[in-house]
Amino acid sequence: MILKKVFLLVVFISILITSYAQTKKDVVPLTQIAYKTTETIIIDGKADETSWEKASWSNDFIDIEGFKTPNHQTNVKMLWDENYYYILATIEEPHVWGDIKERDAVIFYNNDFEVFIDPDGDTHNYYELEINALNTIWDLFITKPYRELNNPILNDWNYTGLKSAVTVNGTLNNPNDIDKGWTLEIAIPFKDLRTAYEQDNIPRDTFWRVNFSRVNWQYQITDGKYERKKDAEGQFLEEYNWVWSTQGVINMHEPEKWGYVYFSSKNVGEKDNFSIPKDEKIKWKLYELYRAQKTYFEKYNTYATTLDSLTGSSIIIENKKLNPILESHKTGYNLSVLSPFSNKILILKEDGKFISK
C-alpha cells in the first residue's frame, strides 16, 4: 500500500508538471444522450439485448490532445435504469492481451478502458474506473484533481455493486494470431455515485460530466508473452491515450473538459434533445481564467490580483459581455460572475471547485 501511495504521488507530480507545460487549445466537450431501458440488462459482455441494439454508438474516439487519429477504433453506447448506469465499449485491437489480475493494481500498465464521472460537475469528488481485457478492476475516488495540493486519493474506495464482463473477439494472450478486439459491458450502481446525501443520485433528465479513455501500449513478445515495448535504453515507450471527448492536453484529470452525458427519461428508441446550458459555457471561460492563474503562479509564485494580468477583464458568451470579479484573499482567490441566462452567481475557487448560487 505504501508503494502504491508513492506511485500515485509520482503520477500527481508528473501530471502537474506536464499538463501546464503543454500548449493549451480550446476544447468544446462532446454530448451524448443516455436513454432509459425497461429491459433487464444481463452483464455478460455479449450485449444482445434489444435495448443495446436500439442505443446509438458514440463517435470514434480521438487522440487525447485532439490532433491525431488513433490506430484502432473505439466506441461506446450508454443506457440507464433506476439502479444502474450502463456502458458498452467496443475496443478494436489486433492483439488482445493482459497480465494484471490484482484488483486496484495499476491497470493502465496494460491496455485498458477507463471511465471518469463527475456527477455534480464541480471538478471535485469524482470517480475513476479502469478495466483491462482480463476484467481486472481499479476504482478510485478522487477528492480533487492531481493539479491541486492536499488532494487525498481514496484508492481503497470500491464500487460495492459494480458489474462488468469482457468478451474477446479472437484469442487472449496469443501472439500467434490476429484478433478483432474486445467488448466491455459495465453496470455502475447509482447508489455508489451520490453527489450529496440530500440529493437524489439518479440523474433523470439532467446531465453528468463524463469521459472515457483508452490506454494502448506498443508491445513486444518476450519468451512467447506480451509485454510493453521498450526503447534501446530499456525504457517503456509512451502509451497512446484515446478518448471520447478530447482533453486538449495529455491529462484526463481536468474534469471541466469532460463530455456531457444527458440521462433522458425517454425510453431507448425514442428521441430527445439536449444542448449544453449557457451557464456551462460561462464555466468554461472561468476555468480558462483559473488555468491562467495557475500559469501566473508558476511564473511569479503568487496569484494575479487583476484580470488584466491574465486574459482580460471581460468575457463574451452568446454575444453577451460578462464582467467577472476577481477577489483575492489570504489563501488564494475567488472568481465570480453573474449569469445573464440563469441569474445565478457562478463562483470558481482557487482550488478549482465550482459553486453556483
Where are these regions (language model features)?
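Structural preference for beta-rich elements and adjacent junctions enriched in aromatics
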Residues: 22-301, 317-333, 343-345
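A short, surface-exposed beta-strand/turn
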Residues: 106, 342-357
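Short solvent-exposed beta->alpha transition segments
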Residues: 304-319
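Short beta-strand segments that buttress and anchor functional surface loops
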Residues: 335-338
